[in-house]
Amino acid sequence: MSNNRRQFLKNSIGTAAAAGFATFPAIANMPVDSTLKNGKNKHWVWINPNQKEEVAVLKKRYKVFYDAGIRGILFEADSEKHYTEAKNAGLEAHRWNWTMNRGDVLKQHPEWSAISRTGDSCVTKPPYVGYYKWLCPSKPEVQDFLKNEADTILSKKYIDGLHLDYIRFCDVVLPLNLWDTYKLDQRTELPAYDFCYCKTCRDAYAAKTGNDPLSLRYPDAQVSWRLFRYNAINNVVNQLAVVAHQHNKKISAAVFPIPELARRMVRQDWTNWNLDMVFPMIYHGFYQEKVAWIGDAVAEGVRFLEDGVPLYAGLFLSDFNNQSELASGIKYALDNKAAGICFFGGVTDEVLATLKQATS
């Protein structure tokens, strides 16, 4: 994970994911009536692989992961060494790839940038933080680039699947915990954070409706304009799904925690994506919610998904005050029919012990 993204997370909850998960007292014996008892759940971890680590270290770590119930890893970078050792330990190894937030791409193609309602490019005026450099999903050139990139990634035999991150528009509404940090009141949509109003999007919307979105009196309330943005991202995802399935490999995505929030905050209509599995980031601290909300979020997501599409509950380890809270979060997720858990943050031996005990 980049230092910029770590800082964004740090600002949101007052502690950095980079610091990992604090050491807590051992978890008390607590009964957990979870679906893992039937042996059908599997659990995941988001990891940025350290290229300098020795193979012996990786062999040991990934065996420990497997023994604790982890069955898959989402790697934020390419590393044949890491992927191979994970697979040797019995784990799936997927490439976690930033999709629409791509400053690296905009350096070469600034004309592909999303444009805000105020007319600003992410290249010259990125919203919120300097690394927020968003592509426009409506541009055919962007779609082709992303498909070619996916094809290149999935052509590698040691990669089992593609995991999409930042597969959305910029946050038109931030999680509640960030409003004070950025001194914003986002009870209404602010034009500087509302995307995309580039010529490609405006012309395409006008062709469908006869209206330029910039001429709309209340663009934040215009249902057809919202749907246009939902479908722009849906189209990108579903094209990438075709590429993945041509390789007979899986495709998944990290998404906002519940369908209603995802659509409202980032134009992300993830229940209409052709994914093999979905990973809602149910980071309860970001939304100033209690641990029990994890169960509510899982239940809502499961209700909206088609039968057979597994939902893995993404848990942000720094949101939990102690191991008992973490065990409760795991229980809430699994009792509401999550297919498993995915950890984000420093996965320590204590975290693995909690997972193993809470699901035994």
Regions found by a protein language model. Give the residues of each.
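C-terminal segment of N-terminal export signals and the immediately downstream linker at the start
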Residues: 24-42
